[in-house]
């Protein structure tokens, strides 16, 4: 790296005898004396000024800059002055993930990160600032997986800023930084009797939704978006290819989560329930935008529709139909007249997926197969959520031996 230090208080000129002589400049005694200059990787000259008696510091700064450039860790001082919010907004706009995911990231950053660290220049970030950020979240009673998601978004922004040369290293990577703690709440699956009770308490037109959720493991958006041509009654399989999701209040058709289409076994009991349902409630042709609100209109013949032959809006369904069924089944209390139902996050329609997974695992199905049926990103995720539901090896051994010796004794 080519660099040099300019003394702005003195200049060198040739004297009468032709020898170089140092003379004071018109700036002598005013302002910062030394200006260290170098040419950055992009060919642009950069500089930093130092006061009188700090020429050695200017030399050290040039040496540090040269070392950073040789290691590929050079940070443009002007880029380092970009604030976290300025960079994060550009980063969000450049993400290629689905629109709903981007909206979620933007919402978390705007609500919780920008007010706390948005104005901080990227080049000034140190581990202490991230530790303070995490503590602020905890002090404001923002915790659990939601706080972990906020932290993950902040870390991703800072990681991209490192890649783009705005800071030398990600402060979130420091050993002293700990992400927000997440309590390891275990999934407690419903009993078969509870599944039946909730099903029986729903209006007749919605009961087969419980069969699909508990018997095929679909997510709520996948159940609501289940089309007639996805159900293969003759081959005993169900193709999960579409879901209905809301993008800023607009319903759209979209691929399943993670764009992972999948085939799942269709139990005969679920197939029967769907046949009976479609006899009473024939599939309804629905047109919605594809993936985003301004996407092309796409038509699907949906198996489940509301009383007006429109899509089942999950917000209305969850409050007015699902919670009423939960209360009737004794899973949540019945509210006083005029009062809303209690929060029932652990008893949402996702509970049907938990029931489905627990039944398969108890029957000895492999984690890999269950992961594929559920549409998880990888089996490790399935294992983290459901490992405690897997029968122990000793329990499996007892079952096998009881079957063998029980049969032998009976014969």
Question: Where are these predicted regions, by residue range?
Answer:
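N-terminal core-binding DNA-recognition domain of tyrosine site-specific recombinases/integrases
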Residues: 28, 47-49, 54, 80-81, ...
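Basic/aromatic DNA-contact patch characteristic of tyrosine site-specific recombinases
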Residues: 1-86, 90-94, 103-107, 124, ...
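Short, basic (Lys/Arg/His-rich) helix/loop patches that form interaction surfaces
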Residues: 140, 197-207, 216, 264, ...
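Basic, Lys/Arg- and aromatic-enriched nucleic-acid-binding interface segment
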Residues: 144, 148-152, 163, 167-226, ...
């Amino acid at each position: 790296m080519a660099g040099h230090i300019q003394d702005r208080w003195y200049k060198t000129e040739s004297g009468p005898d032709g020898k170089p002589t140092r003379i004071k400049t018109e700036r002598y005694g005013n302002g910062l004396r030394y200006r260290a200059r170098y040419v950055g990787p992009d060919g642009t000259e950069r500089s930093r000024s130092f006061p009188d008696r700090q020429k050695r510091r200017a030399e050290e700064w040039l040496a540090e800059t040269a070392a950073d450039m040789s290691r590929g860790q050079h940070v443009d001082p002007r880029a380092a002055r970009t604030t976290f919010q300025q960079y994060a907004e550009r980063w969000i706009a450049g993400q290629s993930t689905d629109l709903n995911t981007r909206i979620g990231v933007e919402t978390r950053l705007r609500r919780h990160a920008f007010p706390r660290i948005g104005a901080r220049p990227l080049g000034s970030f140190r581990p202490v600032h991230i530790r303070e950020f995490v503590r602020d979240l905890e002090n404001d009673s923002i915790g659990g997986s939601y706080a972990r998601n906020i932290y993950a978004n902040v870390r991703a922004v800072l990681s991209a800023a490192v890649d783009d040369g705005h800071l030398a290293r990600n402060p979130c990577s420091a050993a002293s930084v700990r992400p927000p703690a997440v309590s390891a709440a275990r999934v407690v699956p419903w009993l078969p009797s509870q599944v039946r009770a909730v099903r029986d308490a729903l209006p007749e037109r919605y009961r087969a939704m419980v069969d699909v959720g508990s018997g095929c493991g679909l997510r709520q958006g996948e159940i609501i978006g289940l089309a007639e041509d996805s159900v293969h009654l003759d081959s005993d399989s169900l193709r999960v290819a579409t879901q209905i999701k809301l993008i800023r209040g607009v319903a759209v058709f979209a691929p399943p989560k993670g764009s992972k289409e999948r085939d799942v076994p269709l139990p005969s009991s679920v197939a029967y329930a769907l046949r009976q349902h479609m006899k009473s409630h024939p599939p309804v042709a629905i047109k919605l935008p594809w993936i985003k609100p301004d996407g092309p209109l796409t038509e699907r013949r949906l198996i489940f529709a509301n009383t007006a032959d429109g899509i089942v809006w999950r917000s209305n369904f969850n409050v007015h139909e699902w919670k009423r069924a939960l209360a009737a089944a004794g899973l949540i209390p019945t509210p006083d007249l005029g009062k809303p139902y209690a929060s029932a996050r652990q008893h949402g329609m996702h509970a049907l997926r938990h029931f489905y997974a627990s039944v398969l695992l108890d029957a000895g199905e492999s984690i890999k197969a269950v992961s594929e049926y559920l549409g998880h990103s990888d089996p490790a995720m399935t294992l983290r959520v459901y490992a405690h539901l897997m029968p122990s090896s000793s329990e499996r051994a007892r079952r096998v031996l009881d079957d063998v010796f029980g049969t032998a004794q009976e014969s």
